[in-house]
Amino acid sequence: MGFDDSTLQPTLELVLRGATAETAPKFAAGVKQAVTDLLAGGIPEELLLASLNAMEFASLERPGSLPDGVLDAIYAATGWLHTGDPALLLHTDKLFASLREKLSTGWFNDLLKELLLAEPVQVIQTPALPRKDEEDAAPARTDGKLVLDHPLTVADLGDGDRSAAGTVEQLAGAELLHHPSKGSLYLNFYYDLGECTPEEVQYLDLLTDILDELDTPEHTARELQTQRATWLGNSMACISFWTGRQEGSPCHAKLTWNMSLLERNLDKAIALGSEYLYKTCLTGPKAEKAFARVLSQQKLNMEQQFIQQGNSYAAVRAGAHFTVENALTERVSGVTAYHFLCELLEKADWAAVGAKFEALREKLLHHAQLTVSFHGSEAGLDTLRKLLPGSAFAEAERGTACAYTEELTAPVNEAFIIDGGVNYDLLVWPMERCAARKVLARVMSYEYLWHHIREVGGA
């Protein structure tokens, strides 16, 4: 299904691919019946709201790989083509506000009926070679080009406003960083893992993969996912770690909860984040079944990745002897992580796993140092200042942040057997973090190594 508004006459298209001469004529009747069945009960208002929120968020965040300038040019041309106003689709707040007002009026039901219950223009394309008398015929389509009366130049853009400086403050036991911005709102929570043991970080990494499958006292896992899809653009819990630029190159590790959303839904974001992190049921029969299911799937996925990306796993494994960041990467996503998964699956003591998750949640969410990063407007910041102190994120006192550490093991020569039919031989040297060396390594991989090993050597 597609909607094309890049032409003077916008079109709504329903395309059935892979149809046969027998099934193609039944397509229009099937669409009519499906629409009739849907209109019998009406389009659910919560689904319409979720769709509108998702579309509005996409119009602000611009997902995908196209540069914002290219998208703005397309939107400006489309708005100018249909309405004479190039700026209409560049500022969509009024457009979506008017659509939200129509949610409870039945307007969307009437629109669906008008578009899809009317007799459609149906085209059935049957592949065939062109006939001789068609090869020299005039083209059925004549392309034209619209000309702008007043094309913009770089001079029309001006210098633009400089970004406002960020601010730091203490709020509800957390360090709040505000980065002034317009458009979508980004709210990230960073719980410090400096006081965690290596094994605890492994359990936390598993927990972030399992949370989506677990219920809360208020919602089932599926209901909570629907709520997140309705009110948030993106939301994700994960382990983040990196080597800092401070003296000694410390490794910083955080449990992160990231959300992107429309500013008016900030109250929903705080409520959903609190429920997802603090109230998820980590014990009981349903949770234990989810543990076994998710970990078994993860084990299978890793075994497939060993075959497809054995070189990457070998590089991580070898580099783990030289830096804490690499050691932690190996611990949560490398061969060590795979062995940890196998051990848990072999023991199958899911009650103990749930108890471990509960203890870690208490330790981190209520006591670890918390940094809240807020990208949004001043009005949004004022709203956050009111919401955060009364939420589950608030604590009277928290610990201080510190670097994550673990003891590095001495380098060893290792070999692993995988059923991939490809051998990987990896050599690793310790190297201080240096931009010039990174450039040299990239040049070698593109030039010398690629040519001499891949092309000349035939590897």
What is each residue range found by the language model?
Residues 10-18, 187-189, 209, 255-257, ...:
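Short, hydrophobic beta-strand segments
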Residues 413-416, 428-442:
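Terminal end segments
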Residues 405:
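Pyridoxal 5′-phosphate
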Residues 183-227, 273, 434-444, 453:
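Active/ligand-binding-proximal structured segments within catalytic/core domains
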Residues 1-160, 226-400, 456-459:
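Charge-rich, well-structured scaffold segments of protease-associated domains
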Residues 1, 161-202, 419-421, 451:
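Active-site-adjacent "gating/activation" loops or surface patches in catalytic cores
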Residues 59-63, 409-424:
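Short, low-order "capping/linker" segments at domain edges
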